[in-house]
Amino acid sequence: MAALNEFVSVVVSDGSRDAGLAMLLVSRPPTNALSRQVYREVIAAADELGRRDDVAAVILFGGHEIFSAGDDMPELRTLRGAEAETAARVRRDAIDAVAAIPKPTVAAITGYALGAGLTLALAADWRISGDNVKFGATEILAGLVPGGDALARLTRVAGASKAKELVFSGRFFDAEEALALGLIDEMVAPDDVYDAAAAWARRFLDGPRHALAAAKAGVDAVFELPRAERLAAGQRRYVEVFSAGQGGDAGADPHGG
């Protein structure tokens, strides 16, 4: 079943094997350039996926040819003043919306993941890439800096020194280097990308959903909240999980006794 906007769609499997598996599909040929409209549609799709009870895990996909070549540069060049601020905000909100989906998310990366396209991939929990994919934090080549919290996400994974080198140079790098840097979690043949991402996501379809959501929020909070707020939020999620009846097997001793 699909809910279709112009460029972004939500597709939820109704098959018995993959019941609960959904796809957030960006389709704006030929490069999946990310315009303000695309970002708004991503926000709406991410919100829908987060709310739907029939969705347990999500694959972020740009199709079999390309993930995304980044921001719509012709559109960006026309923006001035308040319009530029709005564009920056909607980009950040879209990246944050994907990162905040309270379910396991896997980016299936094909072709190119450049600039904001790389940032969008980094918003997923895991990334599966074809062995021929080219990556790049390429904004500097257009006289820009990465937006949408890209610098923090890239630094979190690759470290400050490597993040600076990639951002300052804007150079392309291949999937093998991305794997070595931890930017992707698995590298497969180009034709196997979606299936590999589905296999990764499939492991979580039968998991305790409230607990998975709480665990994801807790890990993300390590990077986003001060310690006192993080501990308070963690305690609140712990109680909420048990209140929802998702506290695990009542007959099991959590301490192994």
UniProtKB/Swiss-Prot annotation:
Alphabetically ordered keywords of this record: Fatty acid metabolism, Lipid metabolism, Lyase
Broad class of enzyme this protein falls into: lyase
Signal peptide span: none
EC number: 4.2.1.17
Gene3D superfamilies registered for this protein in UniProt: 2-enoyl-CoA Hydratase, Chain A, domain 1, Lyase 2-enoyl-coa Hydratase, Chain A, domain 2
Pfam families, per the entry: ECH_1 (PF00378)
Coiled-coil annotated residue ranges, if any: none
Catalytic activity line of the entry: a (3S)-3-hydroxyacyl-CoA = a (2E)-enoyl-CoA + H2O; a 4-saturated-(3S)-3-hydroxyacyl-CoA = a (3E)-enoyl-CoA + H2O
Entry superkingdom: Bacteria
Source organism per UniProt: Mycobacterium avium (strain 104)
Residue(s) at site: Important for catalytic activity: 139
Membership in a protein family: Belongs to the enoyl-CoA hydratase/isomerase family.
Role: Could possibly oxidize fatty acids using specific components.
Protein name, entry field: Probable enoyl-CoA hydratase echA17
GO molecular function term, any single one: enoyl-CoA hydratase activity
InterPro entries (UniProt xref): ClpP/crotonase-like_dom_sf, Enoyl-CoA_hydra/iso, Enoyl-CoA_hydra_C
